[in-house]
Amino acid sequence: MITISEAAQAHFVKLLADQPEGTNIRVFVISPGTAQAECGVSYCPPDAVEDDDIELEFNGFNAMVDEKSAPFLEDASIDLVTDQLGSQLTLKAPNAKMRKVSADASLVERIEYVIQAEINPQLASHGGNILLVEVTDDGVAVIQFGGGCNGCSMVDVTLKDGIEKQLLDMFPGELTEVRDATEHQHGSHSYQ
């Protein structure tokens, strides 16, 4: 469920040494499954452990995860990153905003998952996003660009060389094309 690097585990052990005995850590997601989802790590004293918590054992401490957050922390990782400015813990949870779908989920659900988990985070750096409108019977994924992507002069390159290539590689034999249904209007919102 959650991977914690050796460096991060050693850091947690050091931090927990200054806490009352029996204190562990809690990894959680606030507003899981939404665009506003935020992940966090906090101390978890023994009296804060809930009956339905999932307890994960690590080297020198345990991590508690509440039942509601658990599916959104699949494939999450915690690391201690050190650079010239010092060190900091990083928590990456690719499924926090949208629950990972099973391999036997519908094509639409699997495409929507990839859009939310992988494509939209990339487009967000330019203030953009895409929305899946439909998947036609002949395997065409129809998408709509929003935010900074609407009216952007590079939208065709983003569509063909980025989004379409990624989706066709991920869904061979199921998708044949990705088509843009956006009525593009260049404006101050558009990424240049």
Swiss-Prot record:
The keyword Iron is assigned to this record: yes
Keyword 4Fe-4S belongs to the record: yes
Needed co-factor(s): [4Fe-4S] cluster
Cofactor descriptive note: Binds 1 [4Fe-4S] cluster per subunit. The cluster is presumably bound at the interface of two monomers.
Top-level taxon of the source organism: Bacteria
Biological processes annotated in GO: iron-sulfur cluster assembly; protein maturation
One MF term in the entry's GO annotations: 4 iron, 4 sulfur cluster binding
Alphabetic keyword roster: 4Fe-4S, Iron, Iron-sulfur, Metal-binding
Residues the record lists as binding [4Fe-4S] cluster: 149, 152
The family this protein is said to belong to: Belongs to the NfuA family.
Quaternary structure and interacting proteins, as annotated: Homodimer.
Protein's job: Involved in iron-sulfur cluster biogenesis. Binds a 4Fe-4S cluster, can transfer this cluster to apoproteins, and thereby intervenes in the maturation of Fe/S proteins. Could also act as a scaffold/chaperone for damaged Fe/S proteins.
Name of protein: Fe/S biogenesis protein NfuA
Source organism of the structure: Shewanella amazonensis (strain ATCC BAA-1098 / SB2B)
